[in-house]
C-alpha cells in the first residue's frame, strides 16, 4: 500500500443538540458506501435521532435503496434547482420536499443531478452550494448524512465541503485499500477551502472473517488508518441480506431484524457515538 499523505485530524466531540453533517465518501465504487449510509442513518433514527439523508449521487441508488420512486419525483423542485439558484435567500423555495421513509427524511436524487457537474463550473461559490442548502433547511435535524458520488468531481467537492467531517467506508480488499492515498490527498487539499475538514472515522465493509485476505487487509486498515481517524468495527458482508434489502427498498435492519448484518451496524453506530462522546 502506498504511504498516506499527511492530513490534519479533525475529530472533535460534538455538542448535543446541534446538527452535525457527515459525508460518506470513497471515490472507489463497490465498497458498500450507499448501503452503509442508509443503514447507519436508520440505526441513528431508531435511537431517537432526527436524521436527514441527502442522496447526492446522480445514480440515485440511495433513493432507490430506500424504496423511493426517483422517476416519479417533482422535477421543478430538485437538488439541482437548489444548487443552481443564485439567490441564497431563494434556495429553500427550490428544495424538493423530503421523502419520509423508515423514520428518516430523504432529499432524493433525480437523474438531472448529473448535469450539475458542468453547470456548477460557471457558478460563484460552486464548492459551497450544498453547504448553503444545508444552512437553509426548513426544519431541524440532529444528523445529516450525505451519500457522495464515487468520483472526484464538483458534486463530490460540494459534498465534502458541506460536511463537518468524513466517514469513509473501506472494503477489506487490497485493491480498495491501495486507492486510499488519492482519497486522503483530496481531503487534504480541500482544507484550503475548509480548514476544519477531516475524517471522523473509517468503516471497514464487505468483510468476510472466513477469508484470510480479508483478515489481513482489516489488520492493514487498522494499522495504517488509525493515525488519521478511528477505525470502526467491520461490517460483515452477507450478500443475500444486503442485496435483498436494497432490492426491497429497506434498511437491512427493517428487512431482516436481528440478522448478523443488522447487529454489525448496531455495533458500528454504538462505537461511533461513544467516540463522539454521545449516548449510545
Predicted feature descriptions by range:
Residues 1-280:
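P-loop NTP-binding core
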